A protein has these predicted regions:
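Carbohydrate-recognition beta-sandwich/jelly-roll modules
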Residues: 41-301, 307, 342-345
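A mature extracytoplasmic/lumenal domain signature
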Residues: 91-93, 306-308, 420-422, 596
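Short, low-complexity, charge-dense intrinsically disordered segments
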Residues: 1-14, 18, 23, 27
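Aromatic-lined carbohydrate-binding/catalytic grooves of carbohydrate-active enzymes
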Residues: 247-401, 413-414, 422-427, 431-433
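Carbohydrate-active enzymes and regulators
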Residues: 91, 305-308, 317-320, 410, ...
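Active-site-proximal substrate-binding groove within the catalytic cores of carbohydrate-active enzymes
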Residues: 162-167, 181-211, 273-275, 359, ...
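Conserved, mostly hydrophobic/aromatic
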Residues: 89, 292, 339, 419, ...
Length: 617
């Protein structure tokens, strides 16, 4: 083959990749859920908990500028086959003067002092104990589109449908009167409203609590999305996920540029960007893995970070050529091969969420999402400078499919990690060259996740925007409100959140491998370790070195006892007394966790202070 033929061959390969990417995106936008749904009808869907249908009154509030109420319309509920009561605002009702649309319901109200609570997100509990409260969950971080309440009059779960990434969730208390409702931010869509807006109420019996709320959401999501399957079902076609579930997670970064605020909060160029520094070489990491294996840690899932061009968060979205400092491609391949020889999973970390001006692919900002006025969206500042939002639709149509192919060829296998992918809402783009709504960008995310399944064997990220629930196999942490509450209270501020329950785990513990929160990562304090155990989490460490290796070995010894639970549904979380809980799993296991400084008992079962006890295994 001569040089001309070789060049033509590479060109044709790129064309084919782009055609395949386009076909995949088209299938996603058309509602195709993947080949995994071929046997969707054979799935055993989780049952909906017992419901208790009662009247619900709901209204749509059409809001104008400065939050003026333009008009109110009473909504008629439509009973669904699964027992839910749906209230809908048609997109055609939205006139040009409407800024926001809110759906208010009489059941979603309470008074200060009422028994019960409001519930949202991963399991944030708000007691009815305040005169004034303003809690707004921005749509950018609304991981599950639901809200729930237990009051003396009503117990319900409500699910928002339509324009999934365009609404906030609010819990307000004014003079002791509480109300919870969604608000669709119509003026900030960046396009015409493209879907109707619906809230579906699932009313539960008076004795029901957050357990039934979570099971109702589980049933709803499984029925709504045929691609959602349990880990046990996924393992049938991707057996390496069984090894992932048995493994302690370790991420090791190898190179990067200095990150220091406010110095990093600028747009760098190739001429003035800071130099890339090598933290650790691939050969050094491999030697540390060997020591870990010799210490008795049999199963590890290593996520190799900082391998790409510019190091960790250095020149995103550019991945190639591989950064030379830690050992280049040759060293990276040695790490992949050597890690697998030890029986470990070795996969990589990518960032196809941010883009930096110092990236060779910047091209005047062509790759970035634009606001309607043409300016850039910015989501923070990292080693590469100001982090602008990457237009995933444009990336998928141009370079991303080829990048993923090349990354796989480096030797990564296991569960490829794409940073932030499921931690924030998909980024809208108003660039006339590649406009995309959040719904369209979500479809691209789905296509990318499926490609990761095919190339690497799995897909992982952080948090869990649950539109990708059927595709994501592992998340580094569910989200970080426990850390947020701790940090606020350390500074003398009262957190809006009163406490936490494992709503996410009750709904999806057997669907996505996870770690509860940022406070339950790395080497843990005894109390945070008990939270990790209570929530059924998988240990994770963000480095591997001589200092933390004893902590990793200790976590491994504990995890060996608990890891059979990773594939099991969490069926019930029961608070037996303050600080003493019993967690039940579908395989019959009972896990008692005692957070108190005294022994506790459940009948004949005694649990020592500050410890846990696993029975039925």
């Amino acid at each position: 083959m001569n040089a001309k033929q070789a060049k033509e061959g590479k060109t044709m390969q790129r064309v084919l990749l782009h055609v395949m990417a386009g076909l995949a995106l088209g299938a996603c936008l058309a509602g195709c859920s993947s080949v995994e749904t071929a046997d969707a009808e054979a799935r055993q869907l989780p049952p909906m908990p017992a419901l208790a249908a009662r009247p619900v009154q709901a209204e749509a509030w059409f809001m104008g500028p400065q939050h003026t109420r333009l008009r109110v319309r009473k909504l008629e509920g439509v009973r669904r086959a699964d027992g839910g009561l749906a209230f809908t605002v048609a997109k055609e009702e939205i006139t040009p003067d409407v800024v926001d649309v809110e759906i208010h319901a009489d059941v979603a109200q309470a008074r200060k002092g009422d028994a019960g609570y409001a519930l949202a997100q991963r399991g944030l509990v708000f007691d009815f104990a305040r005169d004034e409260l303003t809690w707004i969950q921005h749509r950018g971080w609304l991981y599950m589109p639901y809200y729930a309440m237990k009051t003396p009059q009503h117990v319900f779960l409500a699910v928002m449908e339509g324009m999934r990434f365009e609404h906030d969730l609010l819990l307000l208390a004014r003079k002791g009167r509480y109300e919870m409702f969604p608000r669709w931010r119509i003026s900030e869509i960046g396009a015409a409203p493209y879907e109707d807006m619906t809230v579906v109420f699932y009313q539960l019996p008076p004795e029901a609590d957050y357990n039934a709320m979570a099971k109702a959401y589980r049933s709803y999501r499984f029925a709504q999305d045929p691609s959602i399957r349990t880990l046990k079902e996924r393992i049938r076609t991707r057996p390496q996920l069984a090894q992932l579930a048995r493994s302690v997670a370790i991420r090791q970064s190898h190179a990067g540029k200095p990150w220091k605020l406010p110095d990093s909060n600028r747009d760098f160029t190739a001429a003035d960007e800071p130099p890339v520094q090598t933290y650790v070489t691939y050969d050094q990491t491999l030697e540390r893995l060997k020591k870990l294996k010799a210490a008795g840690v049999d199963d590890v899932a290593l996520c190799v970070a900082g391998w790409q061009n510019g190091g960790y968060d250095g020149r995103c979205p550019t991945s190639f050529p591989v950064e030379e400092g830690p050992g280049g491609e040759a060293g990276l391949r040695r790490l992949c091969e050597g890690g697998r020889a030890l029986g470990y999973l070795v996969d990589g970390h990518s960032n196809y969420t941010d883009c930096f001006t110092c990236s060779p692919d910047w091209r005047g900002g062509e790759i970035a999402c634009k606001k309607p006025d043409g300016s850039l969206y910015t989501n923070g500042a990292w080693s590469g400078g100001k982090a602008h939002n990457l237009c995933l639709k444009h990336a998928w149509a141009t370079f991303l499919p080829g990048d993923l192919e090349r990354i796989a060829q480096l030797g990564f296998r296991g569960c490829h990690y794409i940073d932030v992918f499921t931690a924030v809402q998909p980024y809208r783009c108003s660039d006339p060259r590649h406009p995309a709504t959040t719904k369209e960008q979500a479809a691209v995310q789905l296509a990318v996740a499926k490609r990761c399944h095919a190339l690497f064997g799995g897909f992982s990220s952080e948090c869990c925007m649950d539109h990708l629930l059927g595709q994501v196999d592992y998340i580094n942490y569910v989200c970080a409100p426990m850390r947020g509450k701790r940090q606020a209270e350390a500074k003398g501020r009262k957190s809006a959140v009163d406490r936490f329950v494992p709503f996410f785990e009750l709904a999806f513990h057997d669907v996505v491998l996870s770690n509860p929160d940022k406070i339950t990562q790395e080497v843990l304090s005894p109390e945070d370790n008990l939270t990790l155990v209570e929530y059924g989490g998988r240990p994770i460490f963000y480095s591997l070195n001589e200092r933390n290796m004893p902590g990793i070995v200790k976590a491994w010894e504990q995890f060996k006892t608990l890891r059979p639970l990773q594939l099991e549904e969490m069926t019930e979380h029961r608070i037996l007394s303050d600080g003493f809980v019993r967690v039940t799993y579908a395989n019959g296991a009972r896990l008692y966790v005692n957070h108190t400084s005294r022994p506790c008992a459940d009948g004949a079962v005694e649990v020592a202070a500050k410890s846990f006890r696993l029975l039925g295994m």
